[in-house]
């Protein structure tokens, strides 16, 4: 039997009016620099990849098999100063799960030759994982002289503190909204009966800055006995099939040729929420216009103050994590092997984030998400169990992440699209931060008194990622290398996109 046709939609030439959904951390909404799913040479009997395969307008496939290309990056030796020893269990990065980051490029095409670009790439990081980009400087190597009139990070952090009163009001409104939607989705007539509510994102990770005005709520639906079919060797996007779907299942209506359609489920999910918010008392809430490619249904609470809430539908699978994550989550030297094993026994999630190929979207695909693992890591971030507890030593890890997020936020406000900063998302900063934590695992390297130096090290690492255009996804490390191979084999079409 011929494989089912896959729907494809062409990206609109103009964005729709209305407020765009904010970038959701943990990979749950469209990261501006998210690489497209990587096409591969057709194989006998393989499913045709990409929206183009469904519409008949196929993109040109890679001229060379990526497997014939030599290894671009060499594994770096462990730095001699890297201390070793058993790590105490403590509980990253959406994250979640999201495709790896090929960092955004500026609008100019004057980039030099491909060989010179490859020569600039740094060697890989620690042995765990295929490569983590540039080596982050270790705080214990020495302190820089403080410049006259140097900035005061603690004063900035004080300004970023959230008001307890604001937190209380915002949390009450958002929790009431979430509970109301949960009851409706679990009602007898709902196709989503059995969903659970998972609160994720920067607010619940306690790294929210400035104001409690953005929240993420993930509604998870367990789907037992599913089979994943990787989309175009992308490592992050998948078609979802049921190994055995009971007759009369409410999910039958979302099947298309045996594939669980992400677009159909998201459409129905959005429709239910749109109707239900009309019945929420004492809350002025509206739904924002759908953003192409985003898995989130964005609600705007207008009173008592404006709060943006991203509602995400996620499939929950308790099967083993996909093979593409095998070399990801490099936390053994930081949080310990036991913690890593425990985290990898947790479920993984799939969100209706469509794979993108050029200007086309494959609307039946789902994308991996690990936002719950990121939350667990940031909650228990110390190598010792008592790090940042009442009786323990306080570190400055979260403070560094807050400052990095604020730095990017302020630069985007100042320059916006003028310098291409709109292509960056706080998840890029978060991913870089997690790699610095991996390379500098010891709590003694993150003492609160060394905040200035630790933050400087984080910024230095991120700068190196920008200069080399290399930032590896924390959970799916091979995503970036596959995308680069595709670009190299096809004359770097990405240069024409900006």
From Swiss-Prot:
Residues of the site described as Arginine-anchor: 244
Positions that bind 2',3'-cGAMP: 216, 310, 353, 367
Domain of life: Eukaryota
Region (Interaction with collided ribosomes): 332-373
Regulation acting on activity, per entry: The enzyme activity is strongly increased by double-stranded DNA (dsDNA), but not by single-stranded DNA or RNA. DNA-binding induces the formation of liquid-like droplets in which CGAS is activated. Liquid-like droplets also create a selective environment that restricts entry of negative regulators, such as TREX1 or BANF1/BAF, allowing sensing of DNA. A number of mechanisms exist to restrict its activity toward self-DNA.
Modified-residue entries (N6-lactoyllysine), positions: 159
Positions annotated to bind ATP: 202, 374, 405, 426-430
Basic residues bias spans: 1-10
Modified residues (Phosphoserine): 13, 62, 202, 294, 426
Function: Nucleotidyltransferase that catalyzes the formation of cyclic GMP-AMP (2',3'-cGAMP) from ATP and GTP and plays a key role in innate immunity. Catalysis involves both the formation of a 2',5' phosphodiester linkage at the GpA step and the formation of a 3',5' phosphodiester linkage at the ApG step, producing c[G(2',5')pA(3',5')p].
Name the UniProt record assigns to this protein: Cyclic GMP-AMP synthase
Species, as recorded: Bos taurus (Bovine)
